Design a protein with these regions (language model features):
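Hydrophobic beta-strand positions in extracellular immunoglobulin-like domains
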Residues: 82, 103-105, 137
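Hydrophobic core residues within well-ordered beta-strands of beta-rich domains
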Residues: 76-78, 97, 131
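Short aromatic-glycine-enriched beta-strand elements
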Residues: 88-102
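Disulfide-stabilized netrin-like
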Residues: 105-119
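A membrane-cytosol interface segment of integral membrane proteins
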Residues: 116-153
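Alpha-helical transmembrane spans
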Residues: 1-72, 151-153
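Structural detector for short beta-strands of small beta-barrel domains
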Residues: 73-89
Length: 153
């Protein structure tokens, strides 16, 4: 049986950290060129800022992306329970959710929270709801809600 893993677009449209790390790769350069367009010259400080943000964003995004993919590919399915849900307004009609859940792995209780973008699965979650999680035995303190990351775009 082949394990299903979320696509690149599913990850950046669901996971708050992955999306922000991905934006960080390009944001410095966008700011740098927009400033040059309006000011008429290039600002050395913004060049340094962009040159620093790009590799940091690349490394952080690659780490988060690999963490999610490897958890889906090599992790084990475990039951978990949603313990808290916090809603954060990020714009007129957009919301992010901070979802807290707990689960048992190898006889030990773990709690994890994950900030995710507004998706239909996240909106439908309720406190106390049972969910299927994926956790890797090497990093048992991190688990992801399976259905949320595999939800169609």
């Amino acid at each position: 049986m082949q394990e299903i893993s979320p696509t690149f677009f599913q990850i950046i449209s669901t996971d708050y950290l992955a999306q922000n790390y991905f934006v960080m790769i390009f944001a410095g350069w966008v700011i740098y060129f927009i400033d040059a367009l309006f000011e008429g010259n290039f600002t050395f400080f913004l060049l340094i800022f962009a040159a620093i943000c790009t590799p940091i964003g690349l490394m952080a995004f690659f780490w988060r992306y690999r963490l999610i993919v490897s958890t889906f590919e090599n992790g084990i399915e475990i039951p978990g329970q949603v313990t808290e849900i916090h809603t954060l307004s990020t714009g007129k009609k957009r919301k992010d959710f901070i979802i807290h859940y707990q689960y048992h792995l190898n006889g030990q209780l773990f709690q994890y929270r994950n900030r995710v973008k507004q998706k239909s699965f996240a909106k439908a979650l309720r406190e106390g709801q049972q969910v299927i999680l994926l956790a890797h035995e090497k990093t048992p303190h991190i688990a992801f809600i399976k259905e949320m990351y595999l939800e169609a775009l």
